[in-house]
């Protein structure tokens, strides 16, 4: 979940705005033992979960993280879901999941191309909705946990504009719009950066207190290894 895969719903600031997304793991329930890639306290992370997350990343980006990165991602998702479910954080409405699925489908040229891509990466409609629902749940909880305590002042906004945005746009041969028209967008970027930094620190601190065992993944069955970036 590091600044890599939070649901891409925060902000879209041209090519220079950072985007992060992630997906929360559902509450523990009866599972078919298909292979264990990690043990956390009295729970497990399965190979099918790793495969599903990798397939989702391939659907969106054309590639996925490595197996080790996917496992790390799932461990952090477990941490978020464990706390969120303990506090009875509300699940997203079906209509919200519908909207995000429709948005994903709209990135493909037509319905046939979308269905073909789902088949290629190994996802069906039900699995996609499950992953999307987890994404929304996770992103919302992380935002809820950290956003309210983050303050961004005008000096920080001006500094970002002057020392980051303007040089990046100039390097691309583009002229930066006036700061006045970008204040709210830059503020959101800085808030999201702070949320990402605080969540990363939270993951590191929480993992140091958990009993986590990483299982060998060198012998994963054929066809289950996630594709590399």
Residue ranges and their predicted role:
Residues 51-65:
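Short, surface-exposed, low-complexity cationic segments
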